[in-house]
Amino acid sequence: MSSPAVARASPGGNREASGGPRSRNGPWEVGGGGERLERAGAESGRWELLLRRGELLALGGHLKGALEAFAAALRRGAPARPERLGSLVDCLVFSYRLRHGLRWSAAPAAGAAGLLSCLSCRGFLSEPVTVPCGHSYCRRCLRRELRARCRLCRDRLPPAAAASEGTPRPPPLAAAIADFRTSVVLNHLAEKWFPGQRERARAAGRLGELLHEGRYREALAAACDALRAEPSDLTLKIYRAESYAGLQEFKAALEDLNAVLFQLPNWPEVYFRKGKVLQDAGFLGDALQLFLQCLALDEDFAPAKLQVEKILCDLLSPENVREGLKESSWSSLPCIKSKPLGFPSVMEQPHSPAELGLKQPEERVEDAPEPVKGSLSRAQSAQAISAAAVPAREDGLKRVCSEPLLSAQGKGVLLKRKLSLLEQDVLINEDGRSKLKKQSESPSEDCMFSIAYGDIPEELIDVSDFECSLCMRLFFEPVTTPCGHSFCKNCLERCLDHAPYCPLCKESLKEYLADRRYCVTQLLEELIVKYLPDELSERKKIYDEETAELSHLTKNVPIFVCTMAYPTVPCPLHVFEPRYRLMIRRSIQTGTKQFGMCVSDTQNSFADYGCMLQIRNVHFLPDGRSVVDTVGGKRFRVLKRGMKDGYCTADIEYLEDVKIENGDEIRSLRELHDSVYSQACSWFQNLRDRFRSQILQHFGSMPEREENLQATPNGPAWCWWLLAVLPVDPRYQLSVLSMKSLEERLTKIQHILTYFSRDQSK
């Protein structure tokens, strides 16, 4: 007799029908009055599995199968969230790049356009912002490109702020970049060396503000006026194109953007702007191609990826699926060259969870790139569009367009037809570079983006512009804080040892301190290397001398005054005082990773004997404190005391046990050693379980008996382990530490064990 079907929750959170039969081609069979709820739970589990299947197929490079799975999930009721299609977009971009033989476009070398040029747009470095990885960008690029990674080192840029309520994605990265102020030193140098360029950059910034406020007429007038004075400024042409697009004068916007592409054919932002114009004009397929071209050149261009996600989400929506996914919608996708995609097996029939497991798809993405014979932004159109030549604009670049289709009045026609874009369109070479179909014109040499901004008159080079405000010396390993101030790395670290605030503006640097990256500001260092080589050489010489002085292991050895330490015994430390933070950091930076440990002394500040500690690991806490894992090394005697930057130092000599050569004395020492070792084991085993577990947790297990008693300068390791765990006065322990005779040390330990063994027997 079968029991009624009962819904149960799977470990993954999906609901499955248990106990009831399910038809292969029909809905879930459920009993009782909760049929609607049970069916909703089953459908939810099904589309979640389809989404996971689509992600796995996309990660495996199976584009068509991934498209089918995502479309099926949306039809089953999955929420239409574009951000869930990230893996599908990555697969699509990879396929596009492979098909067109493209490679990711890294930033140009600094020398290509001068040092004071933006790594992203290659333009003048206006309002330079230094990101955490140490590279500098103009604020315009960080705001408008909304980069997720550094263009040069591929390091992640600061994350955007938390998403506001009702927003599926975090706000643009520009919100986070706003927390990073303009670099004070770099901005001062840019204004001092290139005042004209700086003023033009300010004017461009005002254009950006007008566009942001939607004042397109004013922005257009200002851009045209600026271009009359600087006709070769490509940034101004981009601003003018955006003004045209805001006024729905799409043809004029495309002409400006193509003029920019003619000069810089591998600039991802321009492809994105051009795609946005076509998207606003209604040419979805052409826009998609341009967004993919943008991502093929720069896979971290976040706005383009978001637009592709939205387009794919629309194409895969149930409405489009029910219409059969028209060929015009899918022909723009790379590697989908055959008839339009249908989804008979995945979409029309229900499947069990077992049937939705990942299988090898029948069709695979083509691996070999094929030469591109047509325009990359030209999609197959359902209707032929006759193009009419348009007189050239002031930039001399001819355009071929259907003018009525690009006007605001023809917007309704645009939504139904494909645009036969431009006679001069972009092609892709096998080497990954773009070229123009029309070869009669070549990019001009006086482009604003190729001016060598690095040619600085000698009289403008002033070493005081490169001085650290803390040490008043030339920057050495300069770092820039989020508030925009620059310091020597060591100087800033020492300040943050005392308080997590900027030494100049007192802005909180708690997050900067917790990150602990301190990446060198590359541009500032390159400027010093190029223009102040002699001063830098002298500064480096001073630094090397200071480092060598800190590297001595017998003179001016740093002393940590805290507790007893013993050879081979672990000694964990919690370091919170600024002076000891500095001491630990210097020990690591010099490479010695060693310092002395002594107990305090009322007369001489610290004892005459101590033990060197070797740093094994350091765990830094967000507020600058650290937990240092050390182990004891050599014993030493203090010869001379000193002080450096707040912590104690000492000249020392190392202690070694006096070796015994006489055979009878060696046998006697062996007998004493074995006797004390057995006595120590007995005492430890007779301890209460609580005490024994605490000792094992803190010091580890007792070392094994050693065959060669004089193999090391400090004797058997178990002696020091036992001395560390025995509850005796530190002065008594210090006297044992200072002994250079193993026999005397064993005798002392034997006396202590005898005393404690009597207490255990009571």
From Swiss-Prot:
Cite the repeat ranges for TPR: 47-80, 201-233, 235-267, 268-301
Q: Which SMART domains match?
A: LON (SM00464), RING (SM00184), TPR (SM00028)
The Phosphoserine modification is found at S420
A single Gene Ontology CC annotation of this entry is: cytoplasm
Keyword set, alphabetical order: Metal-binding, Phosphoprotein, Repeat, TPR repeat, Zinc, Zinc-finger
Instruction: Cite the residue ranges of zinc fingers (RING-type).
Output: 118-154, 468-506
Gene Ontology molecular function = zinc ion binding
Q: Which Pfam families match?
A: LON_substr_bdg (PF02190), zf-C3HC4_2 (PF13923), zf-C3HC4_4 (PF15227)
Give the matching SUPFAM superfamilies: PUA domain-like (SSF88697), RING/U-box (SSF57850), TPR-like (SSF48452)
Keyword Repeat: yes or no? yes
What PROSITE patterns does its record include? LON_N (PS51787), TPR_REGION (PS50293), ZF_RING_1 (PS00518), ZF_RING_2 (PS50089)
The identity of this protein, by name, is LON peptidase N-terminal domain and RING finger protein 1
Q: What is the lineage of its organism?
A: Eukaryota, Metazoa, Chordata, Craniata, Vertebrata
